[in-house]
Design a protein with these regions (language model features):
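Amphipathic, hydrophobic secondary-structure cores in small proteins
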Residues: 6-56
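A short glycine-rich beta-strand->turn/loop micro-motif centered on a GG-aromatic cluster
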Residues: 58-60
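Short acidic/glycine-enriched loop/turn segments that link adjacent beta-strands
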Residues: 62-65
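Core SAM-dependent methyltransferase catalytic element
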Residues: 67-72
Length: 72
């Protein structure tokens, strides 16, 4: 599983990093995006729907941020 650390980056950068990783991923491969920008909570699920990727889950990280599990 590939992990993309986009913590500290502001939107749209987390989504762009995910898009780049998905382009290089094999079908069915799972990726985890770490992001702490509040807009990512909205942007990433929307992007997954538009890109044909599957959002498997979102885990809230402490103290801030989220881990988005995505299947290519």
């Amino acid at each position: 599983m590939t992990t993309i650390d986009a913590r500290g980056l502001r939107c749209p950068m987390p989504t762009l990093k995910l898009a780049r990783a998905l382009r290089g991923a094999a079908a069915g491969e799972e990726l985890t995006l770490l992001a702490d920008d509040p807009l990512a909570r909205v942007d990433v699920p929307h992007f997954c729907g538009e890109a044909g990727a599957t959002l498997l889950g979102v885990e809230e990280l402490q103290p801030t941020g989220w881990a988005f599990r995505v299947r290519a």
